[in-house]
């Protein structure tokens, strides 16, 4: 709407803008003409020109007698006028010639308008007034006397006053005066606001003009003529369109409205009659299938409906889709939404429809008849009209299977009784809503069937009402002849339905009316969607009595009604009542007592028991109610049954007792009650588990405590692994179930017994390992269990079959917390040895458990000094094993680093570390205070030991730490002797370079290190010899040992060719004899090859030997036997042994010189044997 208004205003503004532009153009033209005239005029002052004077004189003659030759009658006055002035303006002043006229009569015109015209004629001045009537009259007067300029000025003045409300009037005026500008302007405004014009706006317009305008403005002139309620215009349209009738009469406009419907909706009976007389279709329908009669009723138009019915409209026409007849629409009216007058008019229409032959049994798209609709709408007026119709079928059902009576029993009337409702504005529901004046009562009086069973479900109206929770309706039907034992397709009676929905009053009434409380359903009822969350007790069950239903759906008030009825039925005078049977079972084999328990109705259950219900009845699966209550975990029901003496000894088909079931279902109160009643607490289940274990295995300590409190044995010997005997404590520890183990300990079970063989000796290792619970807990690392065992007096020093105590087991299993607990125990003995002879400390060291070892040392300070069967303490063993971690640990706990092995060797840890070759351990022992000069039983220091092995680094470490490098052992050997003896080149280098050891010292055998080298030299002897000379260039090579043997002789005797060559190369004497007269020339060897090569390699003359006898023939020198020397080998010879002479070129001896036979051969043959 707002957008349309804006569009119209914009169009109107556009017209005004166009008009303004025209005026601007005209003004510009006028100014142009004025300037042109001024240029052509006399150059004299404009006030002195002839034209100016003439105009001024004419203006002054207005209403003056001067020069007057004419009288004009204006109203009651006579005005002096001048013919020449009038003639100058127009020639149309009178029918006669103006020159012969003495008086002009204008008394028929408005005097004020006339005077305004005369003033303009004389002065050319016109005063506009905001009065459209005045301007219109002035324009008409100007048109009468053909004063064209005045008319144009008035026309423009009127245009500024035109609006929606007066545009029609001005259009008429413009048309009369042929004022085309004004007429076009009004036409534009009419076109812009065509739909906003009212019938009053057209009332003064002539029929011809209005018809002409309507035809020009709309495609549907007839509809517009009816809307403005102009019958004369309709008549003109009918005359003009006579050839196209009646087709034109049945056309719908853009809004889908028919001409006849427009006339009827405005109550234009004459026009409507005219249209009908010209064959307008009274049954014409719109695109929705609604006829004129439907529309008339829809808008509550009694006039239209009556007119159409009288003119033969089809009274059974149905709309498209909804299929509603006029009777349906009439019935839809409700007194809650419409006034009593409207309702009365609808009743008149209904009466007229029925009199005209309307069918009261027609059904709409939902299958509802007008009677259905009137009941649903509460339309008592139409309802009463329909009941009077003899053709009315009361048993027709809608698509939901509902008869009119079903709808009526759901309709509660509002009482108008002042005693019930003293305040008219606040309606209240009357308690007796189904009185004789109610729809339902009137339908039954008219003959409606009270049962009307549904074809799909077989439910009668009574069952439907009860199922919908409408107890008042159900009571009404029950007391008005409904069949109380009617059964639907599932075998359910109204009493079942009432019990299922908790309708206590209806249940009582049905029982009074003779309903059978022992009828059982034949099939399970379908589960409604909204009941999906309800208890499953009522799902898929049949063979239910009404009492089953009431209990299953948890309606205790209904149950009470039936129980009271049983008590009353025995004394009732009414033979209709039947006594309920409480022993009947449903398809799940449940009695009403069981259902009462499951729904928590224990008061009802007690009453049922009081009425003779059996408490120990078994179901088909062998379960009693007590078993079922426990399995449902319904403690309240189970306790209820126990209080009422239910049998606790009955077993299920699986052999389970009530006690086992109660434990399995975690019901502590029920367990307590069963134990209180003397149940056997030792009965095992099918797996051999006693009740106490069942409780503990499921973490039910409260139940276990209850069992123990009632005297249950916490030890409980039973079968174990491999058929041995074990307690529950053994089993709990084996399964790592600490809470259970601790509970059993606190409950006083046997904490010290190991497992036992079975009665016939059954059992494998477990039966004979002798491990107590404390051993087992320590092995599995069960800290809480160990602590609990210690608190409750377990033997901390008990030994198993291997002699191990619990702390042995804990250490071997590396459980630190448990070790700490055991070490902290006041009664523990830390010196107990197992069969391997290991104490706890030894065990800790074996498993490198330093933390445990330290804890033991804190408790037992001498533990670290204990020795094994080889006399070794832990430090000795750790050093021998090169276990630096253990060594460091023992050092950290201040173990004695100088303790000796308690055997024949008496070695210290430092000796052992050197033997093991561990530099890091040697260093740490020295740092820890080990004595570096401690001697072995052979009086050897650690340096002696290191020198014998290839341990140069350790030798350096010992030297750095101040070892006595000059110390000699029992054979007088210092470290260098031993290093040379074992050929340790690197050790020798360290000794020769890093200390001042005496390299020429003789041992007890009179041998220096080089003698040792000659005697014991190995492959690297030559390298060692070179090292000696490198470190000691002036070493005495020819110094003999105690036997008089030099290094060369010793090496030659050992066949050490490399060493011999090195010694000869160093300039040693070749022919020195030992004490036995042996030298390298006469020593018996297999071949002289080595000797010849040694002689051949001589590069300079060797030193001469000295002595008292010949080195070759041993002849003593005297006066007759002179001394000679071999110039090649330097030996001392007699004359006979040195007869050969030969130049020795390599010695730069060019003259022949004396040589021995061997050297002669070497020099002549080249060293070849």
Curated annotation (Swiss-Prot):
Location relative to the cell: Cytoplasm; Endosome membrane; Early endosome
Pfam families according to UniProt: Ank, Ank_2, Ank_4, BTB, FYVE
Region of interest (Interaction with RHOD and RAB5A), ranges: 650-759
Superkingdom to which the source organism belongs: Eukaryota
UniProt domain BTB: residue ranges: 68-130
Protein name: Rabankyrin-5
Keywords: Acetylation, ANK repeat, Cytoplasm, Endocytosis, Endosome, Membrane, Metal-binding, Phosphoprotein, Repeat, Zinc, Zinc-finger
Repeat region (ANK), residues: 217-247, 255-284, 288-317, 322-362, 366-396, 490-519, 542-572, 588-617, 621-650, 654-683, 687-716, 724-753, 769-798, 802-832, 836-865, 870-899, 905-934, 938-967, 971-1001, 1005-1037, 1043-1072
Chain positions with Phosphoserine modification: 270
Motif NPF, chain ranges: 421-423
GO biological process, one term: endosomal transport
Entry binding sites for Zn(2+) 1: 1110, 1113, 1134, 1137
Modified residues (N-acetylalanine): 2
Binding residues for Zn(2+) 2: 1126, 1129, 1156, 1159
GO CC annotation, single: extracellular exosome
Stated role: Proposed effector of Rab5. Binds to phosphatidylinositol 3-phosphate (PI(3)P). Involved in homotypic early endosome fusion and to a lesser extent in heterotypic fusion of chlathrin-coated vesicles with early endosomes. Involved in macropinocytosis; the function is dependent on Rab5-GTP. Required for correct endosomal localization. Involved in the internalization and trafficking of activated tyrosine kinase receptors such as PDGFRB. Regulates the subcellular localization of the retromer complex in a EHD1-dependent manner.
Description of how the protein assembles with itself and partners: Interacts with RAB5A (in GTP-bound form). Interacts with RHOD (independent of GTP-loaded status). Interacts with EHD1. Interacts with VPS26A; the interaction is independent of EHD1 and is indicative for an association with the cargo recognition subcomplex of the retromer complex.
Tissue: High expression in whole adult brain and intermediate expression in all other tissues and specific brain regions examined, including fetal brain.
S-S bridge residues: none
Zinc finger (FYVE-type): 1104-1164
CDD domains, A to Z: BACK_ANKFY1_Rank5 (cd18501), BTB_POZ_Rank-5 (cd18303), FYVE_ANFY1 (cd15728)
The encoding gene: ANKFY1
Membrane topology: Peripheral membrane protein
One function term, GO molecular function aspect: zinc ion binding
């Amino acid at each position: 709407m707002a957008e349309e208004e804006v569009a119209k205003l914009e169009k109107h503004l556009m017209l005004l803008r166009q008009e303004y532009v025209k005026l601007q153009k005209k003004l510009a033209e006028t100014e142009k003409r004025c300037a042109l005239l001024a240029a052509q005029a006399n150059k004299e002052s404009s006030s002195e020109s002839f034209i100016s004077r003439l105009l001024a004189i004419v203006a002054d003659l207005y209403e003056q007698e001067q020069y007057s030759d004419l009288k004009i009658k204006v109203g009651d006055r006579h005005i002096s006028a001048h013919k020449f002035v009038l003639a100058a303006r127009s020639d149309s002043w009178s029918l006669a010639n103006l020159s012969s006229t003495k008086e002009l009569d204008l008394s028929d015109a408005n005097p004020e308008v006339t005077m305004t015209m005369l003033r303009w004629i004389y002065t050319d001045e016109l005063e506009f007034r905001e009065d459209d009537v005045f301007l219109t009259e002035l324009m008409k007067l100007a048109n009468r006397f053909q004063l064209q300029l005045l008319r144009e000025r008035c026309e423009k003045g009127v245009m500024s006053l035109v609006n929606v409300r007066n545009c029609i009037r001005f259009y008429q005026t413009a048309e009369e005066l042929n004022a085309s500008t004004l007429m076009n302007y009004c036409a534009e405004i009419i076109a812009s606001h065509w739909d906003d014009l009212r019938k009053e706006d057209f009332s003064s317009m002539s029929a011809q003009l209005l018809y002409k305008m309507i035809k020009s403005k709309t495609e549907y002139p007839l509809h517009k003529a009816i809307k403005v309620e102009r019958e004369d215009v309709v008549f003109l349209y009918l005359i003009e369109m006579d050839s196209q009738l009646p087709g034109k009469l049945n056309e719908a406009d853009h809004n889908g409205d028919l001409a006849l419907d427009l006339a009827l909706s405005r109550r234009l009976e004459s026009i409507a009659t005219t249209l009908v007389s010209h064959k307008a279709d009274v049954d014409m329908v719109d695109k929705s299938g609604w006829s004129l009669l439907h529309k008339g009723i829809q808008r509550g138009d009694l006039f239209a409906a009556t007119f159409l019915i009288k003119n033969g409209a089809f009274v059974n026409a149905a709309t498209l889709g909804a299929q509603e007849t006029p009777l349906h629409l009439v019935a839809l009216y409700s007194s809650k939404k419409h006034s009593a007058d409207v309702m009365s008019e609808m009743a008149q229409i209904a009466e007229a429809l029925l009199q005209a032959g309307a069918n009261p049994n027609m059904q709409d798209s939902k299958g509802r008849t007008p009677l259905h609709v009137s009941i649903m709408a509460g339309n008592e007026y139409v309802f009463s009209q329909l009941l009077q119709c003899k053709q009315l079928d009361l048993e027709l059902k809608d698509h939901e299977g509902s008869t009119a009576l079903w709808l009526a029993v759901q309709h509660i009337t509002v009482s108008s009784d002042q005693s019930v409702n003293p305040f008219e504005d606040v309606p209240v529901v009357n308690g007796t809503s189904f009185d004789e004046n109610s729809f339902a009562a009137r339908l039954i009086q008219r003959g409606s069937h009270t049962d009307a069973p549904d074809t799909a479900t077989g439910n009668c109206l009574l069952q439907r009402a009860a199922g919908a929770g409408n107890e008042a309706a159900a009571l009404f039907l029950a007391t008005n002849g409904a069949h109380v034992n009617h059964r639907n397709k599932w075998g359910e009676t109204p009493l079942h339905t009432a019990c299922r929905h908790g309708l206590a009053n209806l249940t009582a009434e049905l029982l009074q009316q003779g309903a059978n409380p022992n009828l059982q359903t034949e099939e399970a009822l379908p589960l409604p969607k909204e009941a999906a969350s309800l208890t499953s007790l009522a799902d898929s069950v049949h063979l239910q009595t009404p009492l089953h239903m009431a209990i299953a759906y948890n309606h205790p008030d209904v149950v009470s009604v039936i129980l009271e009825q049983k008590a009353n039925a025995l004394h009732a005078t009414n033979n209709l009542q039947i006594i309920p049977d409480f022993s009947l079972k449903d398809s799940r084999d449940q009695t009403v007592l069981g259902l009462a328990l499951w729904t928590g109705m224990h008061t009802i259950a007690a009453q049922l028991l009081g009425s003779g219900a059996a408490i120990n009845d078994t179901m088909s699966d062998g379960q009693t109610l007590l078993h079922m209550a426990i399995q449902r975990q319904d403690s309240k029901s189970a306790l209820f049954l126990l209080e009422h003496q239910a049998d606790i000894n009955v077993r299920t088909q699986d052999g389970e007792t009530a006690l086992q079931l109660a434990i399995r279902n975690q019901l502590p109160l029920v367990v307590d009650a069963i134990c209180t009643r003397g149940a056997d607490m030792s009965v095992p289940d099918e797996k051999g588990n006693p009740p106490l274990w069942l409780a503990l295995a499921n973490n039910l300590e409260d139940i276990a405590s209850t069992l123990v409190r009632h005297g249950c044995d916490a030890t409980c010997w039973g079968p174990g692994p491999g058929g041995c005997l074990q307690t529950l404590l053994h089993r709990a520890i084996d399964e790592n179930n600490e809470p259970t183990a601790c509970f059993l300990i606190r409950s006083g079970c046997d904490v010290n017994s190991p497992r036992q063989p079975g009665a016939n000796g059954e059992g494998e290792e477990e039966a004979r390992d002798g491990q107590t619970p404390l051993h087992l807990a320590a092995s599995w690392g069960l800290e809480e269990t160990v602590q609990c065992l210690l608190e409750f007096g377990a033997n901390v020093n008990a030994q198993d079959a291997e002699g191990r105590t619990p702390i042995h087991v804990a250490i071997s299993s590396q459980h630190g917390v448990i070790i700490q607990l055991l070490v902290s125990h006041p009664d523990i003995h830390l010196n107990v040895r197992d069969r391997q002879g290991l104490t706890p400390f030894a065990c800790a060291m074996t498993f490198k458990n330093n933390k445990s070892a330290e804890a033991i040392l804190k408790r037992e300070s001498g533990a670290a000094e204990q020795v094994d069967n080889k006399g070794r303490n832990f430090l000795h063993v750790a050093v021998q094993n090169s276990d630096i971690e253990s060594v460091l640990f023992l050092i950290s706990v201040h173990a004695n680093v100088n303790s000796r092995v308690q055997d024949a060797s008496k070695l210290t840890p430092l000796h052992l570390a050197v033997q093991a070759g561990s530099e890091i351990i040697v260093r740490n022992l020295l740092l820890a205070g080990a004595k570096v000069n401690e001697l072995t039983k052979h009086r050897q220091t650690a340096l002696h030991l290191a020198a014998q092995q290839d341990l140069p680094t350790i030798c350096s470490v010992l030297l750095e730490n101040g070892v006595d490098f000059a110390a000699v052992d029992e054979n007088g050997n210092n470290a260098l002797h031993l290093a040379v003896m074992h050929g340790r080149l690197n050790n020798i280098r360290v000794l020769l370079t890093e200390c001042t050891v005496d390299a020429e010292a003789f041992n007890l055998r009179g041998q220096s290190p080089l003698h040792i080298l000659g005697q014991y030299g190995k492959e690297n002897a030559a390298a060692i010899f070179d090292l000696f000379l490198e470190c000691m260039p002036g070493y005495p090579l020819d110094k003999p040992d105690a036997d008089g043997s030099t290094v060369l002789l010793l090496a030659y005797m050992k066949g050490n060719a490399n060493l011999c060559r090195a010694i000869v190369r160093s300039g040693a004497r070749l022919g020195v004899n030992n004490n036995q007269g042996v030298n390298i020339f006469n020593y018996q060897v297999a071949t002289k090859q080595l000797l010849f090569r040694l002689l051949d390699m001589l590069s300079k003359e060797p030193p001469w030997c000295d002595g008292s006898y010949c080195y070759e023939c041993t002849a003593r020198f005297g006066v007759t036997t002179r001394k000679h020397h071999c110039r090649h080998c330097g030996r001392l010879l007699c004359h006979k042994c040195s007869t050969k002479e030969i130049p020795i070129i390599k010695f730069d001896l060019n003259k022949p010189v004396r040589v021995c036979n061997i050297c002669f051969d070497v020099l002549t043959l080249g060293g070849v044997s």
